[in-house]
Regions:
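Conserved P-loop NTPase "ATPase switch" module shared by AAA+ and STAND
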Residues: 73-76, 86-110, 114, 126-135
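Sensor-1/coupling segment of RecA-like P-loop NTPase cores
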Residues: 118-152
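Phosphate-binding P-loop
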Residues: 34-41
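Intrinsic-disorder-linked linear interaction elements in eukaryotic regulatory proteins
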Residues: 333-625
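Walker A/P-loop nucleotide-binding motif
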Residues: 41-57
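Conserved small helical "lid"/interfacial subdomain of P-loop NTPases
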Residues: 152-203
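C-terminal leucine-rich, beta-strand-based interaction scaffolds used for sensing/assembly
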Residues: 235, 239-353, 358
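Charged, amphipathic alpha-helical interface modules that flank catalytic cores or transmembrane segments
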Residues: 1-29, 33, 60
């Protein structure tokens, strides 16, 4: 194969003398690393930003290293299973998974399928994949909706696929060495032009016309320009940002773009006819990918460079709701997974409900988690009890998916108020996970953390401290001192130690943890927010009410902005702020805020939720003379 665009490389503006000729390949700094990786590993993933040159790098290395191998590229997720069978039948094959995120999810790639393909014929089959950095970050170890290590079950299959791959990072901005190598090809006008912009953009980014296409979209909103085309592109971009992994039909774009156009001014923008708008969006005056890629029969997707445009607003409800109403159950699962990862829990439950009703495998499990995370732990535990029963019958008691369902069931049993049962269940799970997965497996370590947490919540603080001390030692050795789970373990240990020990000493330990966490975590990271919340709680317990109230006020704002005002974490922090207001004499302000919090909480939390109990306790205190 001698045409890189057939492998998924973004087309470049045509050469004036040879319009179909691709730009010359310029060796990247990552070239040597990738060559070594493909010879040492059966599965290699190249990670970088849109238009960084990931696909071209993979294509050139594959052609060089595997010239006699068959090239097997499934064009969409439904074709993946057949592509794997084709790769198995070939004497030698490269399985090509450009934009790996499109092959993750229901009926998508799994570690077992890849392992069977690679291990049965070592060296005969190589899996080469690419993925945008933004997509990879969705699956990094993090816990948005809980802080003791179990959210990973919601997207374990996808994360395990990424962990199976040897990852090679590719920078978007070109190094001095890469620019020097490009100088040898500056006679090609496309390379010459790109070299003049390397102070702001990557060379491959310019060759693919990424900045020009983005500017064309932004400028098209002007009255009399192409405002309808811009609205169509906005709808297509947000379809991808909502989690849709397949092309959108022309009819969908015709329906979905109307609110975008209306929000910008509607008729005042002098919008062009729809057919003209579609032609503009697909050609965009550049001989590259266009703002939309596709055609009438196959559907359309937005150029992925646009997904990282600066200052994109959140996906509007009108698009999300309209898309979900039209989506197939499999699409709804993808949308629900992304919504859950993004803490849009109301949207997650709606999408996963649709997927579950449509019979999508695994939707029952993820739906139960989303329901519980939204503040209905008893309902989640009841649903997970059924999931556990089915998985034990179908997969056996020691299968990782069965153990994951036990983990989630035990967690929500504890969240519903039965900490003692949860601690016992996690103790049994630790033994089962150790036997089935190993003592150092992430699931085993997560179960140990939960066992310690609920042991402490059940009242045995001393045992919780002992368990957390042992866990922290093991995690630090396995994962290093800056791993988010190590930092989370330190926070839990400091908290439970403070309940029976010296509060001043615990506060000093927490101050050091804040310093360490700031070095390793982003300011909005959930672990960082949890550490700051514990710090504010210590300050309140030490009697510095005004200082604590100020910290809780800041945290309430940040968590509400990040998660939504009615997320359980945000509700709890808002209640802590009210408690601070009460302790500093702001009773009238506290009463007003508490009334609003109770209204918000009753809308999303199940009756008897511990946040509601806390709110009613504060209300009763405010009513005392």
């Amino acid at each position: 194969m001698d045409r890189p665009e057939l492998a998924g490389v973004h087309p470049a503006d045509g050469h004036p003398d040879h319009p179909r000729l691709a730009p010359p390949y310029i060796e990247r700094d990552a070239d040597t690393v990738l060559r070594q990786a493909v010879h040492e590993n059966g599965f290699v993933l190249i990670v970088g930003e849109s238009t960084a040159g990931k696909t071209r790098l993979a294509y050139e290395v594959a052609r060089s290293c595997f010239p006699r191998y068959a090239f097997v590229r499934p064009m969409a997720r439904p074709a993946l299973a057949h592509a794997i069978q084709v790769a198995k039948r070939c004497r030698r094959a490269v399985l090509w998974l450009d934009d790996l995120e499109n092959y993750l999810g229901v009926d998508g790639v799994t570690t077992s399928a890849l392992a069977e393909l690679i291990q049965r014929r070592p060296g005969r089959v190589v899996v080469l994949a690419t993925m945008r950095s933004q997509e990879v970050r969705r699956y990094e170890a993090r816990e948005e909706s809980r802080l003791t290590g179990s959210d990973r079950d919601a997207w374990r299959v996808q994360r395990e696929v990424l962990h199976m791959a040897a990852q090679v990072q590719l920078e978007r901005r070109w190094s001095v060495g890469e620019q020097d190598r490009a100088e040898a090809h500056k006679a090609d006008p496309r390379i010459g032009l790109a070299l003049t912009s390397c102070d702001r953009f990557g060379l491959a980014e310019v060759v693919a016309a990424g900045p020009e296409l983005l500017a064309a979209w932004q400028n098209a909103w002007a009255p009399g320009a192409n405002p309808r085309g811009a609205a169509i592109v906005a709808a297509a971009v947000d379809c991808r940002r909502s989690g849709l992994r397949r092309p959108v039909s022309r009819q969908w774009l015709q329906d979905f773009h109307l609110p975008y156009l209306a929000e910008r001014g509607g008729p005042d923008l002098q919008p062009e006819p729809f057919d003209e708008a579609m032609r503009w969006a697909c050609t965009a005056a550049y001989a590259t990918s266009g703002l939309l890629i596709g055609n009438y029969s196959q559907g359309y997707v937005a150029f992925d460079y646009l997904l990282n445009a600066p200052q994109l607003l959140p996906v509007p409800d009108h698009l999300w709701d309209a898309l979900l109403s039209q989506a197939e159950p499999v699409d709804a699962y993808d949308m629900g997974l992304l919504a859950h990862q993004s803490n849009r829990l109301e949207q997650a439950t709606a999408a996963l409900e649709r997927a579950w009703q449509g019979g999508v495998s695994g939707a029952d499990f993820l739906l139960a988690i989303a329901v519980g995370d939204r503040g209905r732990p008893r309902e989640a535990a009841r649903a997970l009890e059924g999931v556990m029963r089915r998985r034990r019958a179908q997969l056996g008691p020691h299968h990782p998916d069965t153990l994951a369902s036990v983990h989630q069931w035990a967690f929500f049993i504890g969240e519903a108020g039965d900490a003692e049962t949860a601690a016992t269940a996690f103790g049994e799970l630790v033994a089962a996970a150790t036997a089935a997965l190993g003592a150092g497996h992430a699931d085993t370590l997560a179960a140990r953390h939960q066992q310690a947490y609920f042991t402490g919540e059940a009242g045995d603080t001393e045992a919780a401290v002992q368990q957390l001390t042992a866990l922290l030692s093991d995690r630090t050795e396995l994962e290093g001192p800056d791993h988010p789970q190590v930092l989370a373990g330190r926070r839990s240990l400091i908290w439970f130690s403070s309940l029976t020990g010296d509060l001043a000493a615990a506060e000093q330990q927490l101050r050091q943890l804040v310093v360490d966490a700031q070095r390793a975590l982003a300011a909005e990271d959930p672990h960082m927010l949890a550490i700051r919340s514990t710090q504010a709680d210590f300050i309140a317990r030490a009697g510095r009410a005004h200082e604590a109230t100020g910290l809780f006020t800041q945290l309430a704002t940040e968590r509400s902005n990040l998660l939504g005002r009615d997320h359980p974490h945000a509700l709890h922090t808002r209640l802590q702020r009210v408690q601070g207001l009460m302790s500093t004499g702001g009773h009238e302000q506290a009463r007003q805020e508490l009334d609003q919090i109770v209204e918000d909480a009753q809308r999303v939390l199940e009756p008897g939720h511990h946040h509601l109990s806390f709110a009613h306790h504060l209300l009763s205190q405010l009513q005392l003379p």
